[in-house]
From Swiss-Prot:
NCBIfam families according to UniProt: PRK05309.1
HAMAP family: Ribosomal_uS11
Keywords: Mitochondrion, Ribonucleoprotein, Ribosomal protein, Transit peptide
Main location: mitochondrion
GO-annotated molecular function: RNA binding; structural constituent of ribosome
Protein name: Small ribosomal subunit protein uS11m
Family: Belongs to the universal ribosomal protein uS11 family.
InterPro entries: Ribosomal_uS11 (IPR001971), Ribosomal_uS11_CS (IPR018102), Ribosomal_uS11_sf (IPR036967)
Assigned GO CC terms: mitochondrial inner membrane; mitochondrial small ribosomal subunit; mitochondrion
Signal peptide interval: none
Lineage: Eukaryota, Metazoa, Chordata, Craniata, Vertebrata
Subcellular location: Mitochondrion
Name of the gene this protein is made from: MRPS11
Amino acid sequence: MQAVRNAGSRFLRSWTWPQTAGRVVARTPAGTICTGARQLQDAAAKQKVEQNAAPSHTKFSIYPPIPGEESSLRWAGKKFEEIPIAHIKASHNNTQIQVVSASNEPLAFASCGTEGFRNAKKGTGIAAQTAGIAAAARAKQKGVIHIRVVVKGLGPGRLSAMHGLIMGGLEVISITDNTPIPHNGCRPRKARKL
């Protein structure tokens, strides 16, 4: 134990910053490093007293609960599993948003095509944001305040659709990415020649 103290003291005395012009920055004696068994016992006793003095409380987590696990978090009196889900399917050509209840009953649907965008304009971020605002307005008419968002696909409207839901007045509780990723599955189609 004494060798460790001396080695630590030597290291602290020899260490300097590059721009200190030969000045020693950290010079501490080896005695200040707490390694004694008595100090460890005192620290453990102090920690035990603090734990006993602290009021007992339930475990709190800001993360969504694991399926089957009970959570103390509530949104407007509803559990996490009871909050409606907004499914966003963002392809390269279109973005579709469907809001369903916790029991998977459809509440609202909107896509870039139903909002008046045609052809290549359906695949833009503005169209996805407009569809998000429309889906949020229809869901609010059914009494939805909080939603969970599940995003599927890598299209240009995936983030814009979420912003549209927020702009429409819905409060997003969680965002889940459910994009399918093949683990060397089917052979992909040939690359486009532009």
